[in-house]
A protein has these predicted regions:
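Extracytoplasmic gate region of multi-pass secondary transporters
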Residues: 1-54, 141, 145
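Juxtamembrane helix-start elements in MFS-like secondary transporters
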Residues: 31-40, 88, 92, 123, ...
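Helix-to-loop junctions at the C-terminal end of transmembrane segments
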Residues: 51-62, 149-150
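Cytoplasmic membrane-interface "Motif A"-like loop-to-helix N-cap segments
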Residues: 60-71
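C-terminal ends and interior cores of transmembrane alpha-helices
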Residues: 73-86
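Intracellular juxtamembrane helix-capping segments at the cytosolic ends
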Residues: 105-118
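A late C-terminal transmembrane helix in Major Facilitator Superfamily
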Residues: 117-154
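Multi-pass alpha-helical transporter architecture, strongest
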Residues: 163-191
């Protein structure tokens, strides 16, 4: 459950922005349709970069450390989105790029993380179960955005909620370490 919750928390920020990147660019920053389309492409590009680079990073510093770093950077990216406003293209692009990298990091690392935890034998089934966290985030992220816009007339408050999810994800990386340490201690004692 910790891993499913971690994936959900880690994916919320990306799914908040991916689903509404063009409307965010137009409404918050005042971008034209063409410029908003470029913002969507930028998010997609950084998503791909996150998938590739996070895999390389996780091989060096470990999967859970990489996911913790992605949660931490998501907080930064969401903060940049929160402070961006009309005409503030640079801050918006910094935020959307960081969020893209972090979202890609979760998508790139989680299959290997699942295999490391449960073994390769049933990885397709196990990752399918883990992916339920992504499905939940796919509902929660966009819902936060649309409900915040309806309630306040702005997307800004949604980024604060996204930050709370990223903080929860960061805390879950510590919970995972604690649970995993206890499980490994029990398994070692049984040998």
């Amino acid at each position: 459950y910790v891993m499913i919750s971690l994936l959900m928390c880690g994916a919320v920020a990306g799914l908040m922005c991916i689903s509404l990147a063009s409307p965010l660019a137009k409404k918050m920053i005042g971008m034209s349709v063409a410029s908003a389309t470029a913002a969507v492409s930028t998010l997609a590009l950084f998503n791909v970069l996150g998938r590739i680079s996070a895999g390389l990073i996780s091989d060096k510093i470990g999967r859970i450390n990489t996911l913790a770093l992605a949660c931490l950077l998501s907080i930064v990216g969401l903060y940049f989105m929160y402070i961006s406003g009309e005409g503030d293209v640079r801050t918006f692009y910094i935020g959307i790029s960081i969020i893209g990298i972090c979202f890609g990091s979760f998508m790139g690392v989680f299959p290997g993380f699942t295999a490391d935890q449960f073994g390769a034998k049933n990885n397709s089934v196990n990752f399918g179960i883990m992916f339920s966290g992504f499905a939940i985030a796919g509902y929660v992220g966009p819902t936060i955005m649309t409900n915040t816009l309806k309630a306040t007339g702005s997307y800004k408050g949604a980024f604060l909620i996204g930050i709370a999810f990223s903080i929860a994800g960061l805390l879950l990386t510590f919970a995972y370490r604690s649970v995993n340490k206890k499980v490994n201690t029990i398994l070692a004692a049984q040998k």
